Amino acid sequence: MKTNIINTWHSFVNIPNVIVPAIEKEIRRMENGACSSFSDDDNGSLSEESENEDSFFRSNSYKRRGPSQREQHLPGTMALFNVNNSSNKDQEPKEKKKKKKEKKSKADDKNENKKDPEKKKKKEKEKEKKKKEEKTKEKKEEEKKEVVVIDPSGNTYYNWLFCITLPVMYNWTMIIARACFDELQSDYLEYWLIFDYVSDVVYLADMFVRTRTGYLEQGLLVKDRMKLIEKYKANLQFKLDVLSVIPTDLLYIKFGWNYPEIRLNRLLRISRMFEFFQRTETRTNYPNIFRISNLVMYIVIIIHWNACVYYSISKAIGFGNDTWVYPDVNDPEFGRLARKYVYSLYWSTLTLTTIGETPPPVLDSEYIFVVVDFLIGVLIFATIVGNIGSMISNMNAARAEFQSRVDAIKQYMNFRNVSKDMEKRVIKWFDYLWTNKKTVDEREVLRYLPDKLRAEIAINVHLDTLKKVRIFADCEAGLLVELVLKLQPQVYSPGDYICKKGDIGREMYIIKEGKLAVVADDGITQFVVLSDGSYFGEISILNIKGSKAGNRRTANIKSIGYSDLFCLSKDDLMEALTEYPDAKTMLEEKGRQILMKDGLLDINIANMGSDPKDLEEKVTRMEGSVDLLQTRFARILAEYESMQQKLKQRLTKVEKFLKPLIETEFSALEEPGGESELTESLQD
């Protein structure tokens, strides 16, 4: 048999041309099956390419080609190659595909909704629910978790501290008393239970208030709920608060109602009482009195606890067994509850204050208790009494300092043989200052405050008074603040002259309190009486050109009684006006208008221009400044010359030091082999 061997080099030579259309159909069927998603244009282009390939093979079937070339021109491979290329070129972007999918899904939904209206309603409800859930989630995420926060420096927080202090003090005083005096617990059990559980409710409410109490972080109040809770939990007080609300009352079921000492854990909330006392001390206007009363309360509580312990020890030893313990309760006189407590309180007071005069102890346990009481009395009461003494001395410190000043002035007047009338006037003036609380030096008190707070206090106190002056009514706020800080309070006695006619005016005055009289030269005849809010001397400190009175006083002003005035000096006003030139011109214009109304302005002199005296003063000032600059320049020049001389001396020293070294190096270079030695020395 003869076998036909197919030559792979000419794979299409022995194949008849009739087989090609069948292969093309087969390839087209594969293409249509694999690429049905392509458009009709793509299919048309593929068919054109396949026809071109047929003609190409018919014309070049007998030409020699390599395997790669034959492979490229095979009908099937060529078609698939072109399909892949066209799919890569015509591939749509992802966004367009997504849009097409959305459109298809919407169209499908519409078709389904037309068919099933119930499904449509269900889908709409589901969509609404999803939208609501998304909105709530977004709100929760966007919210900063801010809640109603209590400001720790506000009145609400302070009032709550007062509310929580009451149950704390109740527990600290009554639990120990009820535990030691059985009648007190059994006779009023219903009332104690009500008070106990009301205090427990207040304790629980206090824990909630703590989680809503803000704190300052970089000067800003923190209002984040989670931060507040985390800060409270991280604090030691949270653990104490939890321990203080543990329901130990359940032990009543086992031990009975006569054991109120099981509620001793309620005493752990004492820090709230201390906080209330501290805030009250800062708020009250009488801090020394409050401190003293606070210490007295501590003393009473210590004596109360010691009295209860004494009675319980007497009960343990046996009433009336010896002279030291409480007497026999079978005696009607000592069987009453009031007598039991008062007797124990009396014994505790005598013991802790180390006064004594109590029956001596008999048993060893009694001796130990008395020794402990004496130690407590010595340590605690010594500190408490010392604090009270220091507080009382602080309360009298101002009076003592004031009295020392008065005594020093009295000694001076006696030494200088001052008349008795003058001495009486001085003493009366000091008495007026003390009784009216005008001994405080405002500058000394406000010295420790920052400038901003000091200015605000001065504005609150003096700004309204300064605005009453006509020339300052329309001035800038900044200038008024500057002037307010420069006002000086002064007090004048009855009959004192504030100013006399013809005196040079260097100050203006504003009456804060009191009455002043404009009197004649005899000092008796009164023309006008000035009262609170009046002012005078404002024109003289402006030194307006053309004033007929110049800068001298035009009237005699005398104090009728004790008068409080504010004084503003000319130098302070001019210093403030240097930063406000527009305000200066406005004040001068107002002063001219006032003088024109009163007929005290010479218009010709006012319109003459600048005064030659002022020009001379300016020239002298300029000459002085030039002289100062010359002296400074000469000093700088002398310093420069001295520095230059020192630099020259240093350079000469360096030359002397380096000259022999350089000469030796150059001499070594001139010798044969010197260069190599020099390089070796440099390398070393």
Curated annotation (Swiss-Prot):
The chain crosses the membrane at residues 162-183, 194-214, 240-258, 264-282, 290-313, 337-371, 372-396. Residues 615-669 form a coiled coil. One of its GO terms (biological process) is visual perception. Residues 184-193, 259-263, 314-336 are extracellular. GO terms for molecular function: calcium channel activity; cAMP binding; cGMP binding; intracellularly cAMP-activated cation channel activity; intracellularly cGMP-activated cation channel activity; sodium channel activity. It catalyses: Ca(2+)(in) = Ca(2+)(out); Na(+)(in) = Na(+)(out); K(+)(in) = K(+)(out); NH4(+)(in) = NH4(+)(out). GO terms for cellular component: membrane; photoreceptor outer segment; photoreceptor outer segment membrane; rod photoreceptor outer segment. 3',5'-cyclic GMP binds at G537, S540, R553, T554. Residues 397-473 are annotated as: C-linker. It is found in: Cell membrane. Disulfide bonds: none annotated. Residues 39-54 have a biased composition (Acidic residues). Glycans are attached at N321. SUPFAM superfamilies: cAMP-binding domain-like (SSF51206), Voltage-gated potassium channels (SSF81324). Residues 34-145 are annotated as: Disordered. It is a multi-pass membrane protein. Pore-forming subunit of the rod cyclic nucleotide-gated channel. Mediates rod photoresponses at dim light converting transient changes in intracellular cGMP levels into electrical signals. In the dark, cGMP levels are high and keep the channel open enabling a steady inward current carried by Na(+) and Ca(2+) ions that leads to membrane depolarization and neurotransmitter release from synaptic terminals. Forms heterotetrameric channels composed of CNGA1 and CNGB1 subunits with 3:1 stoichiometry. May also form cyclic nucleotide-activated homotetrameric channels, that are efficiently activated by saturating cGMP, but poorly activated by saturating cAMP compared to the heterotetramer with CNGB1. The channel binds Ca(2+)-bound CALM1 via CaM1 and CaM2 regions of the CNGB1 subunit; this interaction modulates the affinity of the channel for cNMPs in response to intracellular Ca(2+) levels. This is Cyclic nucleotide-gated channel alpha-1. It comes from Mus musculus.
